[in-house]
Amino acid sequence: MAENVKRKKKKRAVLIVLMALVLAVLAVVCVYETELNKLDSNDGVDNSFYDSQFKNKKVMVIVPHEDDDLLISGQVLPPMYKNGADVRVVFATNGDKRVSAYTRQSEACNALEKLGIPREKVIFLGYPDGTQLYVGKKAFSFSSGWDHTYAGKGFKDYHFDRFGTHAKYTAENMVDDIESVVLEYRPDYILAKDFDTHTDHRGVSISFEKAMERILKKESGYTPKVLKCFGYSLAWKSKPDFYALNIKSTVMQDREKNNDPSYETDVPQYRWNNRVRLPIDKKSLSHSILRCSEYKALSEHLSQYAYCYSERIINGDSVYWNRRTDSLTYNADISVSSGDAS
């Protein structure tokens, strides 16, 4: 009898301790959430900037892979779109080297929807991932085996949607399709990746430059503002500094990691002091990374484990360099007085 009483007392004591622990944990969580809400409650970035710069403007993002859009524009696209910009996101490849095109394209659309960008604003050019297409080698999709543009089930590649046929995998066709999609929508602003440390990033960057050269020669009155940036050195492979004080700004990559350490960036003519900084709406940020809208979008790219790089990608600004499109040399006929002009 006495032993039963002792057991009941022990059980009661254990239950009381457990309940006390649960209540303590709940109290800590409540206090944390309350303080976090206080820290995160702000008016955000002055929307007059996005309203004055992007309202009723056309903005196009051109990137190699599904998830690269988040690296270079994931934090600025939402305020652009919310303040009246007509946004288009163009993916050059299907990202299908190890994962199906359907998976990558679905992830991209789901991620952008997390940021408020609807699926109809997304364009897939449908070129292969991880090939030597850009240097004239014959290219095939690693996952599908096809040698022409395509899209996953439920999606359409741009060339087929526009012209009724698929485009063969050639460097020239990619340039043609980039030129076509730019001229079709005629964006006022173009955000694109520059000469990054990735084969596809470099190839698409060069293809974009070739397409823009053609466009500027053909359309002398069309001079969109082109902003280019690095998705690897300033995002995917940058410092994991979300919880550091420099969340206020993207930090410059260590020079020894550059293609040539004697320059500040991977493109020699880009000086760090000449970068263009677009502010981030603080409402999309939080002192808890799990609350950040960019983190939620990155979490949709499960095949790439993109959320694991959130501490590197999420920043207090987005950094670009202005690629001038108003140079008279684009319309000039070049000649030489002697020697070989080739």
Model-derived features: positions:
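N-terminal Lys/Arg-rich, disordered targeting/topogenic segments
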Residues: 1-13
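Active-site beta-strand->loop->alpha-helix modules in alpha/beta enzyme cores, enriched
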Residues: 13-20, 26-206, 210-221
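The feature marks non-catalytic terminal segments
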Residues: 18-33, 45-50, 107, 111-115, ...
